[in-house]
Structures are given as structure tokens and as C-alpha cells.
């Protein structure tokens, strides 16, 4: 895994997966498969313009999240532990076996996030066939629009989150 570009506005992760583009595409663009490696159960298929709702698999534990914040050197904050369904994302664009994107509130479980007013970030997945399998690039951008009091925390928590999710998708696809 490499991190080709990181700034204060953009997180980029890249990984080469030992699977054909068609397999990686299913893991990314099929809502059920996406949920399996990402840790959410989603309420339906990904459709451009549709807002997806999901529930966390397992327990979202405030103490564990605060501990993760400390390990990342992020100023700790309270956490809104979701009950029931939580808006996860609004699908932007789907280009089969090449590109998938959605918008969401970055680090949306932060107690200081205001879901009514918070600007969203754009999450993009780009797939490219390479000799070893598929190069997957994940970019999340738009952090400079996040309110200043949350920006650094949201960026660092999502930076750590994407590092973990790249490993999750690798294990999911390589093990399939």
C-alpha cells in the first residue's frame, strides 16, 4: 500500500490487489459486499443520487474511539453513538469496473458534527487493471470545507480509517 498524496484537503490511498478488476469492482460497488469489508449493513443497492443508510456491524464503543483518537494524536472529542440507521452516504457516480464515488460527512460520529449543516467530502474509488491484478485508488477530498473546529480531527480520523479500510478490502478480496 502506498500513500501517493496527502494534503490538508485530500487523503489518497493506493493498493494493488491480487484479483481481477471484476472481482474488486463487486467488492466496491455492490452494497452488500462493500458493507462486509467496511463494517456496515446498508439498506439497498448503490444508485447514483440515492442516499444510503446503514448500521454499524457490532458495537460502536465511545471509549475505543477516544483511545484511537489518542493513538493518532488527535484531540479527543465526544462521540455520537448512532442508534438505528445512520445516513452513511449519497452516491455520486458509478462507471462500471472503473469508478465509484459518494459523499458523506467525514468522521460523522464526532459529537461536534452537525449533520444538518456539515459539508460533505467526496470519496472516490478508481480501479485500474495492472499485471499483478487491480490497482485500487481511494481519494477523499473536501476537508478544507469542514468547519475549522473539526477539520484536523476529521482528517486524521479518516486518514487512519482509510489505512485500515485498505487492509480490510485487501483481506476481503484476496480471501475471496
Regions found by a protein language model. Give the residues of each.
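Short beta-edge strand/loop motif at the mouth of beta-sheet-based domains
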Residues: 12, 32-86
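Amphipathic alpha-helical segments
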Residues: 18-37
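A short, structured loop/turn motif at beta-sheet edges
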Residues: 21-22, 45-48, 92-100, 126-135
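Hydrophobic pocket/interface hotspot
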Residues: 24, 34, 52, 91, ...
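Short acidic N-proximal helix/loop "leader" segments that mark the beginning
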Residues: 1-12
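Hydrophobic/aromatic beta-strand elements that line small-molecule binding cavities or substrate pockets
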Residues: 15, 86-93, 120-129
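Short, solvent-exposed aromatic-acidic interface loops
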Residues: 103-110, 139-146
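A conserved amphipathic terminal alpha-helix motif
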Residues: 142-176
Amino acid at each position: 500500500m502506498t500513500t501517493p498524496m496527502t494534503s490538508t484537503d485530500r487523503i489518497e490511498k493506493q493498493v494493488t490487489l491480487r484479483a481481477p478488476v471484476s472481482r474488486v469492482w463487486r467488492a466496491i460497488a455492490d452494497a452488500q459486499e462493500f458493507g462486509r469489508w467496511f463494517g456496515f449493513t446498508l439498506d439497498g443497492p448503490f444508485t447514483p443520487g440515492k442516499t444510503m443508510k446503514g448500521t454499524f456491524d457490532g458495537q460502536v464503543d465511545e471509549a475505543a474511539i477516544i483511545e484511537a483518537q489518542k493513538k493518532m494524536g488527535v484531540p479527543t472529542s465526544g462521540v455520537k453513538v448512532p442508534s438505528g440507521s445512520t445516513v452513511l452516504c449519497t452516491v455520486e457516480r458509478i462507471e462500471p469496473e472503473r469508478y465509484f464515488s459518494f459523499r458523506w460527512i467525514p468522521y460523522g460520529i464526532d459529537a461536534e458534527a452537525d449533520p444538518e449543516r456539515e459539508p460533505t467530502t467526496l470519496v472516490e474509488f478508481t480501479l485500474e487493471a495492472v499485471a499483478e491484478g487491480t490497482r485500487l485508488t481511494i481519494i477523499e477530498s473536501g476537508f478544507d470545507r469542514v468547519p475549522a473546529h473539526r477539520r484536523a480531527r476529521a482528517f486524521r480520523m479518516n486518514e487512519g480509517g482509510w489505512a485500515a479500510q485498505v487492509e480490510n478490502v485487501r483481506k476481503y478480496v484476496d480471501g475471496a
